[in-house]
Amino acid sequence: HARRLVTTSPVLSYTKLQSLLNNPYFKVKEFDLVFDSDISLEAALDILKAEVVSAVKKGNSIIHLVEEMPDENYLSINSLLAVGAVHQELVSLGLRSDANIVTTSSSARDTHQIACLIGFGATAVYPTLAYQTILDLSMRKELKGSAHENCARYRKGINKGLLKIISKMGISTISSYRGSQLFEIVGLGDDIVQKCFTNTTSRIKGKSFQDLDVELRSLDEYARSNLADINVGGLLKYIHGGEYHAYNPEIVKKLQEAVSSGSEAVYRQYAELVDNRAPAMLRDLLVLKKIQHPQDIKAVEPVKKILKRFDSAGMSLGALSPKAHETLAEAMNHLGARSNSGEGGEDQERFYKDRMAIGKT
């Protein structure tokens, strides 16, 4: 019978990682994702792929990709790029079933990032920077409980998040999700997609390897600079001068002002803020083409008939507040379009009134 290693989760603890790497029955080959800054990111990936293929052909069944802080004059390949490139190379050569890809990742911290690693080929993930952060916070008493307990809670949360992600795709086991590539890429060019995420949809294209190389070097320079404060960035919470948020305080405040005052002039100011912002969503890139010879307005359907084909998405009471739920229904009724009550329907007091949703789910 074949010898097998069984783990209860693709997110490894330190003990599980060491047990896996030091198992006498499996040959392990470790690859540091650090490369000399004199070569390009794309060249470093090509070297990594060749070395991994050679190791697998020599019988190494566990490939350990390690992403950690590099020394000066060195850079590190992002673990997702590395996992994707290695996975695709092994698949193309018919070697993927001969090896498992385990990654010690500093860049993967939340459920989406870890799901991406697994979805693009990783067998298991050890999120080292997340654990180091939890250890530091526990030692400074900023988190209740011991470091061991907090790391266990973190893994439990990640596992729940992964189960939620895969279940939404109709998948019940992590082995079925591994390498499935059930993603759409936003903002990466064909050269990166072809090498690291082959056949994954990337509709609007975007950055090339050269762009990522420049960003990587800039980030390395910033990380080594003697700054008094670390830039938090504002990815999760809005910070002035940080990551742009579509619903930032200026826009939200103006919308609230327009709603409370009922002033069309204030609403126009809100609309102008939204329309003139830098692209933050795919819909911001949508532009209506102007034709040279407009169609005679009498030759097309009237607005009232066209509006009948519009509907608002079904959203249940609870997901929306009662006021918002009723306002949507009332607005769509006034337009002559269709609203949708969402799951659970609506209060019978709204029946046969302007606040009644036309569609019932």
For each feature predicted by the language model, list its residue ranges.
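Generic structural signal for helix capping and beta-alpha/helix-loop junctions
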Residues: E72, T111, I134-L135, E349
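Active-site-adjacent structural elements in folded domains
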Residues: I47-E51, P70-Y74, V86, V102
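Glycine-rich, proline-tolerant flexible connector loops at the mouths of alpha/beta enzymes
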Residues: L65-L81, Q348
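Glycine-rich phosphate-binding loop at the start of an alpha helix
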Residues: K49, L80, T111
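Flexible, glycine-rich loop/tail regions that form catalytic "lids" or insertion modules at the edges
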Residues: H1-A44, E51-A55, G59-I62, Q113-I114, ...
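Alpha-helix-loop-beta-strand connector modules within alpha/beta enzyme cores
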Residues: L75-I101, R153-K160, K164
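Glycine-rich beta-to-alpha transition loops that act as phosphate-gripper elements at the mouths
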Residues: N100-T111
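A compositional/structural signature marking long, glycine- and acidic/polar-rich segments
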Residues: H87-E89, D98, Q132-E149
